[in-house]
Amino acid sequence: MSRIFIDVREPYEFATGHFKGAINIPPSQLLAGAKKLNDTPKDTEIILYCLSGSRSNSSMNILRQMGYTNLVNGINKSQVKAKYGVE
């Protein structure tokens, strides 16, 4: 099963650096931006991250309400990098 990394920081933050292949969907755009996930099975592992974990946590709750079941609040880039070995 594949993983999807969603960087929920604002676009200007995303532009300063993000994981290769990460999708940028800020919380304010999550409902509209979730179209990027249309073909994604609801049980795909989705790791969300931001700067401190607050935005990724609220975004995780929204995605859960949309039916996604395998969600991880990765907190921030450093913790995601340490746990998943992504660059």
Predicted feature locations:
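Rhodanese-like catalytic fold shared by cysteine-dependent sulfurtransferases
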Residues: S2-I4, V8-I47, L51-E87
